Amino acid sequence: MTVSQKGSGREALEPLLADGVRELGLALSDAQLGKLLDYVALLAKWNAVYNLTAIRDPRQMLIQHILDSLSIVPHLAPLGPSSVLDVGSGGGLPGIVLAIVLPEWTVTVNDIVHKKTAFQAQGKAELGLANLSVVTGRVESLQPGAEVPAKFDVIVSRAFAELADFVTLARHLVAEQGAIWAMKGVRPDGEIERLPAGAHVEQVIRLNVPSLDAERHLIKVVVDAGG
C-alpha cells in the first residue's frame, strides 16, 4: 500500500472532513458526515470505470470536491429551505453534497451525459436522499412543469460554462426572487464584464475551502424577470 493510499482510507478521511466542517462553521450530524464519506467511497468506486473526475485519490476528492462544495453552504443556508438546480453536475457536485447537508431543501442534479446521471441516481438510492431528483438533458431544454416541476430559487454550477453562457442557458428556470450562483476559481472579472443584458452581479464572495491552497469565488447573478 502506498503512502497516498494509507492517507486515503475512511479512517484517515474522517478527521479531515470533521476539521473542514468545523472550519466552515457548519453543524452536521454524525449521519450526515457518514453520508459524505459514503459519497466519496461511491465516487471513487464508480470513477474507476466511468471517469467521473480526473481526481483519483479519495483524500483529494474530499478536499477538492466535498469541502469545495461545502464551502458555499454558509452562504446559501441563510436563504432557508429552497429549491436548487445543479447544472452540469457531473458526479453530483455540488448537488449531492447540498442534498446531504440541507435535508429540508429540494435538490435537482442535471447533466447531459447519461453515465453521469446514472451515477447520480445510484447516489440518490445508496445514500437515501429523498430530497434529490436527477434529470438528464440540456439545461436550455428543461421546462418548468415538464422536465422539472417548477422554476428554482437557486441555480448553481461548479464547472459548467463561462458565466455568460451559464446565465443565458439557465435564466428561464430562475424563480421570482431567485438567483444564479456560479462557483469559480480566481475572480472572473472578464466573465462578469461579458454578462448578457438583464443580468447583473449582486455578490462576489471569496470562499475559504479548508485544506485547499487555491482561490475560489462564488458569484451571485440576478436576472430580470422574464429574461
From Swiss-Prot:
Its EC number is 2.1.1.170. CDD domains: AdoMet_MTases (cd02440). It is found in: Cytoplasm. InterPro entries: rRNA_ssu_MeTfrase_G (IPR003682), SAM-dependent_MTases_sf (IPR029063). One of its GO terms (molecular function) is rRNA (guanine-N7-)-methyltransferase activity. Its main location: cytoplasm. Keywords: Cytoplasm, Methyltransferase, rRNA processing, S-adenosyl-L-methionine, Transferase. S-adenosyl-L-methionine binds at G88, L93, V139, E140, R158. It catalyses: guanosine(527) in 16S rRNA + S-adenosyl-L-methionine = N(7)-methylguanosine(527) in 16S rRNA + S-adenosyl-L-homocysteine. GO terms for cellular component: cytosol. Specifically methylates the N7 position of guanine in position 527 of 16S rRNA. Belongs to the methyltransferase superfamily. RNA methyltransferase RsmG family. This is Ribosomal RNA small subunit methyltransferase G. The gene is rsmG.
